[in-house]
Amino acid sequence: MITHAPIRYQSKFYFYENDYIIGASIKMYGEYTQVEVDLLKNYINSTSVVYDIGGNIGYHTVAFASMAKEVHSVEPNDRNYLLLEKNTQHLNNVKLYHCACSNVVGEAFISDYDTTQPGNYGECMMSETGQPCKTVRIDDMDLPPPDLIKIDVEGHELKVFQGAYNIISKHRPVIFYESMHGTGFDVIYDTLTTLGYTIYYFPAKNYNPNNFNGVEQNVFGGGGVINCIALPASHGKIAGLPEMCDRTDNYNIALGRFIKAKEKQ
């Protein structure tokens, strides 16, 4: 069932009632991983162009649209795209693309979910079966130069990077992507550091104590995701986040190194 609730960016935001992560967070807290938006807003202003690759039902897209000049949001799953359209239909600075970003132009499949059953609807990923979808390369999409690219594609990150290499190497945007080891994570590190990027880990808990609705109850426990934010040389450093120092690094190693360095100060 589709329902709606107010969020900090608009009075009605549509979501699926049975989604026990994104939907539950919107319903209870009026937001979803707002800590990610709070980090990324430091790199968005009224002239910024943002790509939201893996727009899902649009929370980040709507948030970005409140700050940026343009937001280009890509979502392949039909059910997600339906709500992405509903949630952004009043926003003149948002353009939507019903496809999947990859390293080839063609066709593929994206996993689906049953909205009559409880589930984590944010886990749609490229699959051998499921909904058919078109695949595109970001380099071929004729988009304006990006200032920020957010990528959340459940393990397909490397192929998105491969299909966007020309855009990234030419324009050096800030890039925010999910940390999924074993899916080309080391190759992404090599690619970005060769281009002069510095990569930091950014853990995002599902529960935000400063949530929009002011709810103190934490229904998610310690659940969340580990992300990476990659900054080009022109953006300097981030003092408060653990840096990824080589292609085999992981969050726990980087965090331990970060804590030890702080203790020595």
Identify the function of each model-found stretch:
Residues 1-265:
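Phosphate/nucleotide-binding beta-alpha loop and adjacent structural elements of enzyme active sites
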